[in-house]
Amino acid sequence: MGIVPTRPPNKAGEILAAEVVEGRPVTKENIMESNTRLTQSGERVPQGLRGVRERARKNKQERFTALLHQVTPALLRDSFFALKRKAAPGVDGVTWQEYATGLEDRLIDLHGRVHRGAYQARPSKRRWIPKGNGKQRPLGIAALEDKIVQQAVVTVLNEIYEEDFRGFSYGFRPGRGQHMALDALYVAIKRKRVSWILDLDIKSFFDNISHEKLVQLIEQRIADPRVLRLIQKWLKAGVMEDGVWSETEAGTPQGAVISPLLSNVYLHHVLDQWTDQWRQAARGEITIVRYADDAILGFEHQDEAERYLKELKEHLREYGLELNEDKTRLIRFGRFARLNRTERGEGKPEAFTFLGFQHICGNNGLGRFEVRRITDGKRRRKKLQELKQELRRRMHAPIAQVGEWLRSVLRGYYQYHAVPGNLPILSRFRHLVVRLWYRTLCQRSQRRPTWQKLGPVFDHWLPIPHVLHDYPDARFYARRQMGSHPR
């Protein structure tokens, strides 16, 4: 078994407190009262769902026939306040602030429609945003009430699926994130017998999920026909673009709150369970870390990696999926791969990229094997190009205003990328940002400012990078000891 955990981290915890809902009118108190508990991840979960979680944990085969009653006015209220307040409106044209006016009456009406079967899902509004390669990708914006109901249903279903999902799955799950996935991968490569890395890329995964097969997979756990009808409504709601409606025959709804959970359910059955069964029968060690549709596997033996890849292609076809042949790679990587290539005079092993970091075989100061992680070059260049364009737009804005903005950008960039070993790359990134700002300031006037004059300005506004993340193995094992990251 791999070093990554095989059970989810956030079990049902002790009841810490009953939350008092703020700002509700006295007349609505009994209807809107929210009796909640906190999970280990800090998620707010209605107390009534504790039994659902316990049943899901104790009986992995149970099909839940009565779940919709868990969607209460109080849960809808919590779901509303969990939404982004500045998000663009969908086809309904309703913003968060507008819906907040008369909120309690709106939620009681919505609750009634959901339980009577009168609730209708609206199509998502499609917008197009540029990609780094010059192409565009669609962005869906859901209607506000769809977001509220979906968030409530996700809260209910998470109580079941968080007991089912594998420990090596990290994407879009309560209490988990990208750096947890990166830590798990680092530890697996460093501590386990990994000589080959398989970098999987499923072609247009979110667009090719079979609705029929997805519902069949959900039905293995969910047997409440009302919840199933809600999910089918969202799947069939379609897309509205320039006033024209189009049907969606496959894929998860664009911009839908429930889409990440649906995609995780699909991959749990299609990839995670299948891989778990496959590696239990393997003769060598196999590790896997998955974040949404981005998965990295480590193999001890080349022949098993090649056989896994061949059988996976056939398996995915049964579910309407296929690998992107141009992006899926099997490469030598790891401690033993480095030694073998050095002995053959083949140079260093190839690198691979996962969650924005390029992973490289290297050595630490003592000459021992180390996985080096640096910001992916494509991501870095894309960010610099975005900053260049925005600096041009802000060319004549006050220096202090631009400085505040750049400081915020750099801090956010460091917050994700400032891992051990990546400081030289971040220092270079800051230097390039300084040059971009300097060139922009030079274009404001015919009088070219000097470096000596602007140096203190750059030093004041642009923070120096520092390591903000602990070493992965220390952080990984600390989580496991605290019980938030078990095997």
Q: PLM features: residue spans?
A:
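Non-catalytic terminal/accessory segments
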Residues: 1-487
